[in-house]
């Protein structure tokens, strides 16, 4: 998983073409997904697009969480090459397991490859008080009840839309 942002009108047009193709050719459970090969095959490259690493859900984050740091380095170089001066290592602090280790290793990669970092939030619900309602919705979608001790816990209470001040406080230890 990688987050693409439009940097310019050219980037908007490119992303529109990629998403249109994904809707026509590559849907997974009704969700359009852009294939990495399409980014490599595009004549104008990725000009006009900014890429964020995807934090724990991106290839780099997954490699770090699997303790495969050499692979994480290879992936970091690949994405940095594909998005020159437009690839950011994404950092999140939302209460998931191994979060501190993931942030630390992500910072190591950012320093090693001279990449900027960006603090983001994996927002799943609007307000902090909406967590329980969100969990109920997730249980309904997955066929569980809230009291089921075996149900997956994929979300945390911290995944609400934080204010700028909350994000600044959360990442105050980083530049």
Where would I find each of the regions flagged by the language model?
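Phosphodiester-processing cores and adjacent nucleic acid-binding clamps
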Residues: 1-175
């Amino acid at each position: 998983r990688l987050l693409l942002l439009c940097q310019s009108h050219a980037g908007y047009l490119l992303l529109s073409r990629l998403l249109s193709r994904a809707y026509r050719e590559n849907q997974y459970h009704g969700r359009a997904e852009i294939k990495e090969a399409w980014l490599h095959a595009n004549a104008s490259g990725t000009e006009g697009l900014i890429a964020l690493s995807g934090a724990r859900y991106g290839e780099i984050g997954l490699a770090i969480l699997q303790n495969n740091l050499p692979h994480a380095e290879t992936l970091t170089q690949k994405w940095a090459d594909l998005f020159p001066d437009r690839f950011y290592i994404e950092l999140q602090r939302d209460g998931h397991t191994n979060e501190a280790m993931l942030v630390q290793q992500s910072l190591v990669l950012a320093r090693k490859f001279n990449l900027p970092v960006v603090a983001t939030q994996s927002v799943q619900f609007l307000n902090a008080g909406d967590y329980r309602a969100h969990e109920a919705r997730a249980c309904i979608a997955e066929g569980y009840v809230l009291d089921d001790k075996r149900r997956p816990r994929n979300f945390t209470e911290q995944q609400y839309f934080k204010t700028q001040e909350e994000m600044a406080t959360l990442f105050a230890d980083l530049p």
